[in-house]
Regions:
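Conserved phosphate-binding/catalytic region of the ribokinase-like
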Residues: 1-5, 167-168, 172, 199-304
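Glycine-rich phosphate/adenosyl-contacting loop at the front of the ribokinase-like
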Residues: 1-78, 244
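A glycine-rich helix N-cap at a beta->alpha junction
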Residues: 75-88
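Conserved phosphate-binding/catalytic loop of the ribokinase/pfkB sugar-kinase fold
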Residues: 85-86, 96-134
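Conserved beta-alpha-beta core of the PfkB/ribokinase-like small-molecule kinase fold
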Residues: 134-204, 224-226
């Protein structure tokens, strides 16, 4: 058993970018980059790099890339005993084609395999998961699975990452079962029905989530930082002006990992939010979804 168990997706991300202007209906010389991704997987990797005792619950196909993704997590110290290989299936994949300015022209996603993480699958690992200090749920999971997890593990704190506005909708019926949640502004609007135009609206949306039963709320505000509250302590944290941003791609997943670590360490909601901001600042200094330089020493240094 691990202190932190992440239930979610493991993806293979493939990105192609041309050396020159993209030519349609033709073969374009360029670079093809392959990386392991998935919200759940990225959260697990970040938490492991921060020194967390982490387990991953997921599914992969019986292809080489899926097995390599599993092996990489294992090499980081993540318990992958609950990552199941499905025979005859492809691992989840995301293929993006960029133009010469590195803007996305086209993308394909083949992620149906995540639907194999079913309530039955969860029940098979019930004892293992229930022994965690906190469980993280990836918003890519099905609505049935989210609600089942809330009911099945009601004695264990659950963290939910909505992932996107459309996917946040799946959690509306079981919001009260989450100990903590990290929506962005759009996701908070969808979950609460409150239009957010300023700080007062952010507070109102967070209060609505607390009313629904969530214990700790972290609403991320893009370049403006984060708002945190647990009903007793609340506040806004802003990014430092000296922040060096290479890419914001991995900021959200690293923030989520820091919330998990803060929970395990018994940190206050403010301390946890500060950990999230520090982790996000590290993540944004890399072009990768997970910064290889993510570590607990650097996070603690940025908290001082």
């Amino acid at each position: 058993m691990a202190q932190i168990t992440v239930v979610g997706g493991i993806n293979i991300d493939i990105e192609g970018s041309p050396f020159e202007k993209l030519k349609y209906h033709d073969s374009n010389p360029g670079r093809i980059h392959l990386a392991f991704g998935g919200v759940g997987r990225n959260i697990a990797e970040n938490a492991a790099r921060l020194g967390g005792d982490v387990a991953m619950v997921s599914v992969i196909g019986d292809d080489q890339m899926g097995q390599a993704a599993r092996k990489e997590l294992e090499g980081l110290g993540v318990d992958v005993s609950c990552v199941r290989t499905l025979r005859g299936r492809n691992s989840a994949m995301y293929l993006s084609i960029l133009d010469d300015r590195r803007d996305m022209e086209l993308a394909f996603c083949d992620m149906d395999i995540i639907e194999a993480i079913t309530p039955v699958f969860l029940k098979e690992h019930r004892e293992f998961i229930a022994g965690s200090r906190i469980i993280a749920l990836d918003g890519n999971l099905t609505e049935e699975l989210l609600c089942c997890a809330v009911e099945m593990f009601n004695g264990t704190p659950i963290f939910f990452d909505p992932v996107s506005g459309a996917k946040a909708l799946k959690a509306k019926s079981c919001l009260g079962g989450f100990e903590s949640i990290k929506p962005n502004i759009l996701e908070a609007e969808i979950l609460t029905g409150i239009t957010i135009d300023g700080e007062d609206d952010v507070r109102r949306a967070a209060d609505r989530l607390l009313e629904k039963g969530v214990k700790r709320v972290f609403i991320t505000l893009n370049k403006d930082g984060v708002y945190y509250t647990d009903g007793g302590s609340e506040g806004f944290l802003r990014p430092v002006d000296s922040l060096k941003i290479v890419s914001a791609t991995g900021a959200g997943d690293s923030f989520s990992a820091a919330i998990l670590m803060g929970t395990v360490w018994g940190k206050t909601v403010e301390e946890t939010a500060r950990m999230g901001m520090a982790a996000a600042s590290i993540a944004m200094e890399s072009s990768c979804a997970v910064n290889r330089e993510m570590n607990i020493q650097e996070l603690l240094r940025r908290l001082t």
